[in-house]
């Protein structure tokens, strides 16, 4: 910051050259770092990992560290059950990179969730939510989206739905599923489940959706569109065990 650039042109016969001279001044460093977090749950999670923050007193001011910190906190909260958290709830304020003492304070604010109902925007406390119901829809297709599922199998807390007779053995199938009943919401488990189901190469589409039951519980739906050539079923050897 606060660098000076001097531009000069050297004119000669049939030739001209230009040069830039950049003078770097003293960089800005972080001074006090204050935090204002609306949610007690989120505040507790933040404090438990503050030692890993990219923003530390005495460190040089860098834009990229603010982006890294926002990404770190978003991943932390969304893998600790805070399903409704999004990066735009994090804001950084009171930053002055032109301060004469080359130090800047930082105020980080993390707000509660904002929701809209009937045109009114309200603030709702962020909560840790658990997954209480998991449905696996094994043969979804747009052409049959309005049809009722004829076959339903319940196994170990999961409900399997199929338009025709279920072609998969639930116990074997679940080796590729890392989302479990009673588990807190985690982005990592959602991504891992999607990855392993795609690795089976049985399904053309893999979608994982969540729906809020109440402020403490979520339901999860694993929606699968099979490839025709794999309509017979899943080979046990193709499953990656968890």
What is each model feature region?
Residues 1-242:
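Immediate N-terminus of the mature polypeptide
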